[in-house]
Curated annotation (Swiss-Prot):
L-methionine binds at I422, G423, S424, E475, D590. Gene3D superfamilies: 3.20.20.210. GO terms for biological process: methionine biosynthetic process; methylation. The active site is at H685 (proton donor). Its cofactor is Zn(2+). Belongs to the vitamin-B12 independent methionine synthase family. It is an enzyme of class 2 (transferase). This is 5-methyltetrahydropteroyltriglutamate--homocysteine methyltransferase. It comes from Trichodesmium erythraeum (strain IMS101). 5-methyltetrahydropteroyltri-L-glutamate binds at R17, E18, V19, K20, K110, W552, E596. The keyword Repeat applies.
């Protein structure tokens, strides 16, 4: 019998967002590459020491990144598309991430069903993988020096890497054959450094179609096993499904399973677990922020102990999806804080559970956790009115009063290629400082609102001057599209230091749903009315949809996600009604996170999509026929959920298509999407400024797929992260491109 502890990755942004600040300073040429790397390494080394101090025995290392871990492996393998090969070193790396001088960046998409985004490798016939592992080997050497034998290198497996790549005129098997010798070479070098075990992260195994690659998995692992290192095969986010029986036979020494999601426990009971392997028992949920329920988890571990002799207790995945330390959240009510668990607390829970399994735990620690939960349930807000409203919902509450074509006749007529933006305009340091000063009490409400209104006036004047057709107020009062609404809803709370990485230098603070959700007052009406009073042109009301609010929050675990989504939908529904009363003829209900909530296995999609679509419709069905309802979705693959997208019954959908080579546009066309579409004609995540000619070409491509009457012209996402000197010429060129096409 062997009981141990492991980790599979750790937050890498710095407790005070040091990496973000360093990246932005480097991009602005305020610090050197050496200074940037020094800061990132200090954060990385601090995380190793934190895990060591907590008592973790085998610590996953090598997951720290300047931007994205998949981009790192693309770079190490020399999988660099031709358009970036003119650049060298970090200039090339960041050009791939962000674009440069008009060159499109790599496509960005969701990391499985999380809110993290990775950069999609592009593998084309002209690319021959050629490895340079020097940075990774340097990391391993540092880790060995600091934490010794506890260091276990984390490597993205070749099959997951290829599975997540875009293959253009190349065969999966051919690329695998080219990559495997490079992987074997890396493992050989690690062995020479004295490494005895590696983690090979294989999340692609949880996809429902992974059995189609059974031969490739078996061949790859047989080849890598020849090196003679202990291979710890790591899966997460779902169960192995039908792959379980043959995965258990792969030549590895450990297999990690996520026991917080899916049916892995049932698979173990049905098929057993090989006695010659260690089970990495992912029992501490790496993706939520709630403390363990000790009785449930210890019972699960005791059950596993009766089946499997060698167990490593660990988080279910990398801890990059949770903040660092809940003890810093001194503003949260104690009853709530006591049942929250961030990365450092999850390390403590991992060690506590390991001790409980060996009979060495402190009984009072376990009892205290249960007492905390009892106190929390007394504190958590309940709203009987909301519960009653949900019980009383009727079919008509989910349906607009007219069909799309009937509504179209009632709505404001606009010129061909109508122009708009997705909502936000640049959030400068001055704007962020303004909100911070107001929160600290350094400004009165009147002083704060006067400055917000000045920003709105500037934004409206700017758009009018460009000739934009449907304006937005700019969202200067909003630090985040979820946080802004959550702060005004009962049942939500927010952290002060709870930052997690969304992509690159973009960090977010997901709110926490801890009780029933209710809208006590209007949330967006004042700013809308200010903006609309400044122009004769229509201004869009801007709301975040219920499914995105849910998927970008840490949800409750005591009631279903569906019920939480419906509570949110009722709140958004009331806000939409108030926007109409204030004169809004265009209202956007953003759902960028609709697809990311999908279960990873397709057979479970139907249930999720049913209630997700219903939640959106519940929030928008109350709109009058003359109100044009827009929605926005980004970083999503729509082809396989197109019927659900159509069922949303939005009048206009704007999408992220600028990095996707018109794939999403083709999918909409193939599905005979009936409503209007804003394809997203340029990439806002790149600092490059698109020319009018480039944007004209983008629109010409759109015309190949959609009739002119269906096309809107907009950027692919909000402009919040751009600077004014980037946003102004880009949007002006966009409007000019649309106007020039009208004149043809």
């Amino acid at each position: 019998m062997s009981i141990s502890t492991s980790t599979l990755g750790y937050p890498r942004i710095g407790k005070n967002r040091e990496v973000k600040k360093a990246l932005e300073s480097f991009w602005q040429q305020k610090i050197s590459a050496d200074e940037l790397l020094k800061i990132v390494r200090e954060i990385e080394e601090a995380s190793w020491q934190t895990q060591t101090k907590a008592g973790i025995e085998r610590i996953g290392i090598g997951d720290a990144t300047l931007y994205d871990q998949i981009l790192d492996w693309s770079f190490r393998f020399g999988i660099i598309p031709k358009r970036f090969q003119q650049f060298q070193n970090l200039e090339c790396y960041f050009a791939m991430a962000r674009g440069k001088d008009g060159i499109l960046a790599l496509e960005m998409t969701k990391w499985f069903d999380t809110n993290y985004h990775y950069l999609v490798p592009e593998i084309t016939p002209d690319i021959t993988p050629k490895a340079d592992f020097s940075d990774f080997l340097e990391t391993v050497k540092r880790a060995k020096k600091i934490i010794g034998k506890s260091a276990v290198p984390i490597i993205i497996s070749p099959i997951t890497f290829i599975r997540l790549s875009r293959l253009e005129s190349v065969e999966f098997d051919n690329i695998l054959a080219q990559l495997l010798p490079l992987y074997s070479d890396l493992l050989t070098k690690l062995k020479k450094l004295g490494i005895s075990e590696i983690q090979l992260h294989e999340p692609a195994l949880v996809f429902g179609d992974s059995s189609n690659l059974k031969k490739q998995f078996e061949m790859a692992y047989a080849e890598l096993a020849k090196v003679g290192l202990n291979i710890h095969l790591v899966t997460y986010f779902d169960d192995l499904g039908e792959t379980y029986p043959w995965v258990m036979k792969l030549p590895v020494t450990s297999i990690s399973l996520d026991l917080t999601r899916g049916q892995n426990l049932e698979l173990i009971k049905s098929y057993g677990f090989p006695a010659d392997k260690t089970l990495g028992a992912g029992v501490v949920d790496a993706r939520n922020i709630w403390r363990i329920r000790t009785q449930e988890v210890t019972s699960l571990l005791e059950e596993l102990k009766g089946i499997i002799p060698n167990i490593s207790v660990q988080p279910s995945a990398s801890l990059q999806f949770v903040p660092y330390d809940v003890r810093r959240e001194v503003k949260l009510p104690e009853a709530l804080r006591n049942v929250l668990s961030f990365a450092e607390q999850k390390l403590e829970e991992t060690v506590l559970l390991s001790k409980a399994l060996t009979g060495k735990s402190n009984k009072s620690e376990i009892e205290n956790i249960e007492i905390y939960w009892q106190e929390f349930y007394k504190f958590s807000p309940a709203n009987e009115k909301v519960k009653s409203q949900i019980k009383a919902l009727k079919e008509t509450d989910f349906r607009r009063s007219m069909s799309y074509l009937e509504r179209l006749d009632n709505q404001i007529k606009l010129p061909a290629f109508p122009t708009t933006t997705i909502g936000s305009f640049p959030q400068t340091k001055q704007v962020r400082k303004l909100r911070a000063r107001y929160k600290k009490g350094e400004l009165t409400q009147a002083e704060y609102l006067a400055q917000i209104d000045a920003n709105i006036a500037y934004c409206i004047g700017l758009q009018e001057g460009m000739g934009m057709d449907v304006l937005v107020h700019g969202e200067f009062e909003r630090s985040d599209m979820v946080e802004y609404f959550g702060e005004q809803l009962d049942g939500y709370t927010f952290t002060t230091h709870g930052w997690v990485q969304s992509y690159g230098s973009r960090y977010v603070r997901p709110p926490i749903i801890f009780g029933d959700i209710y809208r006590p007052h209007a949330m967006t009406i004042r700013e809308f009315e200010v903006a609309q009073s400044l122009t004769e042109k229509p201004v869009k009301g801007m709301l975040t949809g219920p499914v995105t609010m849910l998927n970008w929050s840490y949800p409750r675990t005591d009631i279903s996600r569906q019920e939480q989504a419906f509570q949110l939908a009722l709140a958004i529904r009331e806000e939409l009604k108030d926007l109409e009363k204030a004169g809004a003829a265009f209202i956007q209900v953003d759902e960028p996170a609709m697809r990311e909530g999908l279960p990873l296995k397709q057979q479970r999609w139907h249930e999720y999509l049913n209630w997700a679509v219903d939640a959106f419709r519940l929030s928008t069905a109350i709109a009058r026929p003359e109100t044009q309802v827009h929605t926005h979705m980004c970083y999503s693959e729509f082809g396989d959920i197109m019927e659900s997208i159509k069922q949303l019954d939005a009048d206009v959908i704007s999408i992220e298509d600028s990095r996707s080579n018109n794939e999403t546009l083709m999918q909409l066309t193939d599905a005979d999407y009936p409503a209007q579409v804003g394809p997203g004609v340029y990439d806002v995540h790149s600092p490059s400024i698109p020319t009018t000619e480039y944007l004209r070409e983008s629109l010409y491509k759109c015309i190949q797929y959609l009739p002119v009457t269906q096309i809107w012209v907009n950027p692919d996402c909000g402009l919040k992260t751009r600077r004014w000197e980037e946003a102004i010429p880009a949007t002006r060129n966009m409007v000019q491109a649309a106007i020039s096409l009208r004149q043809e």
